[in-house]
């Protein structure tokens, strides 16, 4: 059964790669030519490697296999592993970069990702290390179903019932359990929160459905929030995946991307490149900010596994234009929601001060959708459109210059660093915050 599911998902990935190649040909070959030149330069320079280059290659190989807690410890940070049980029995793993007595900061990953997303690019790039360097007690969550949270008090991951959840349940049960655990361990009454993509989706579900948790969060930093998705309907990959789920083969899938992507991409150098193209086809192309050398590390941790129902739920909100709980048959909806359609989430109930970061080349979170979401949220204190036009959905984590283009702005919002110039550094906090709100 497991082998059959793997073959089905490999076929889906092959279709995605095929679509990506067509997209690349339509866009043009400039990026391909540039990348080929870079590859030739790399091949020519292998013999001339410096000791630093050899060390980098060794680190890349090692970092692709280490677990998140060991990865954190490797780079000299105090690392801890915590386990949290949700109200409905899922056992979640949390990773911590400990700073005793410092304000707690919870980071929550996106779809098919894990806590690794916030550390995978290393101390000079990744957000978790940056926050730890600026005196935060950093906690990294793992949603049910990914490689670190595949346990339950009564259910087995090999049973289909284990996978009967979406990001609705992550918001209803996972995030509250993790927040309560962090506050209990640290003794703080509130924490800061940052989510990427689905990490925002589930957060807004939590705050709208369990509004008491608004009072447990100091601020929400929303990176590429996947909430409204009306403008994503024509995305070719969404169409392909939707057709797949409607097929006889795809309708039986319960879990996805638990090693299949990694298996395909590591077959040859060409399949690795095709996989990069497939990712770009989904999230947006940006070769200039993509560190090709780090892709083996990314592949070691991403994708980390996901329930098919999570993906189906996203497709539902894309097609319907409604940010709402999972929609079943009309009869089951009547039983669950007392209506033929599930009710929309009430975003006005999200009262946490929320700062939104988005980009123009994000194929999964269109700027128009993000701005519509901001209009409906209860307390948007600022929004920031990343200036680089090519910045894509995964650049929020993987971009070479993400610290300069994005994280520095976040630290300014959090009050950790002043604005860029000496003159700006002398401005009052109110002026700095006001500038951010108007941007």
Swiss-Prot record:
Keyword Signal: yes
GO terms, molecular function: triacylglycerol lipase activity
EC number: 3.1.1.-
Pfam families: Abhydro_lipase (PF04083)
Residues carrying sugar: 124, 151, 346, 379, 426
GO biological process: digestion; lipid catabolic process
Residue ranges, compositional bias (Acidic residues): 29-51
Subcellular locations according to the entry: Secreted
Source species, domain of life: Eukaryota
Predominant location: secreted
Gene3D superfamilies for the chain: alpha/beta hydrolase
Record flagged with keyword Glycoprotein: yes
InterPro entries linked: AB_hydrolase_fold, AB_hydrolase_lipase, Lipase_euk
GO cellular component terms attached to this protein's record: extracellular region
Keywords (A to Z) from UniProt: Glycoprotein, Hydrolase, Lipid degradation, Lipid metabolism, Secreted, Signal
Region (Disordered): 28-60
Function: Could be a digestive enzyme.
Family assignment from sequence similarity: Belongs to the AB hydrolase superfamily. Lipase family.
Name of the featured protein: Lipase 1
Native source species: Drosophila melanogaster (Fruit fly)
